[in-house]
Amino acid sequence: RVSNLTIHPLRNIIDLRYVG
């Protein structure tokens, strides 16, 4: 989710938590 990083960096962190 590279595009998400640029739009919502916080959202990307949450996604990483879900994967982990």
Curated annotation (Swiss-Prot):
Localization per Swiss-Prot or TrEMBL: Secreted, Extracellular space
Keyword Cytoplasm: no
Tissue note: Highly expressed in the placenta between day 60 and day 100 of gestation.
GO cellular component: extracellular region
Enzyme Commission number, as recorded: 3.4.23.-
Note: On the 2D-gel the determined pI of this protein is: 4.6, its MW determined on 1D-gel is: 55 kDa.
Protein family according to the UniProt entry: Belongs to the peptidase A1 family.
Protein name: Pregnancy-associated glycoprotein 55h
